[in-house]
Amino acid sequence: MTSLLDKEAVPETISTSLAESQTGGMVFWGPHHRYLVMPPFPVTKGSFSKTCEIEPLYSLMHQEFLLGLVMVRLGEYGIGVFQGEKLLASKVGTGLVHARHRQGGSSANRFRRHREKQMETFFTRVCQHAREQLEPYARRLDYVLYGGTKETVLDFRKQCHFLHEFDKVTLDRLLNIREPKKSGLAEGIQEAWSSRVIQWD
C-alpha cells in the first residue's frame, strides 16, 4: 500500500500521518479531492478498490467494541466500561491534591513533599477504583483509552501496576477531557469513537 501511495505522490505530511497512526488509515482518492481517514480503532485487513469502497470503514464503525476509559486529572478521575457507546460500569470522584507552590526555600520543599504524598494517595485510590471497574471485564476488553493531562496520566500509569496488563490493548491517543466526571465520560466515549479526517487536493 505504501508503494501505491508513493506512486500517487501523496504529500509527505499525509504519508507520515498514516505511517504514525496506530490504527492505520483509509485513503479515498477522487478526481478533485483526496481524503485520509484514520479510524478510532485499528484496521485489521488491508485492501484496495478502484471504486469508493466504504464497507471496511462502515464495518469497523459498527463493531460493538468493549472499551475501558480511564480519565485522570489531578484531583479528579472518571473510569468507565462501555459496550459500543453504552455505559456498563463507571466510577467518578475527586481527591485533594494542592496546586504547585511557586515560592522557593525550605517551606517550598516541605510543600512539594506533601504534594507528592497527596498525589501518591490519590493515584492509589484511583488505581483501586480502576481495578474494581475493569477487572470484571478484563479478559474481554477490546481496547483501553486514557484521558486527561498527559503528565498526570503518565505518572498515574507508572504507579498503577494493575493497568499494565492492558498495555497490549491500550491505544496511544489521549482523550482531551477537561473534567473527568459523569459528563466527561459521555464526552470521552464520543471522542473515543471519532475518526480523524485529512483532506488534500
Model-inferred region functions:
Residues 1-201:
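Terminal alpha-helical anchor/extension segments at protein ends
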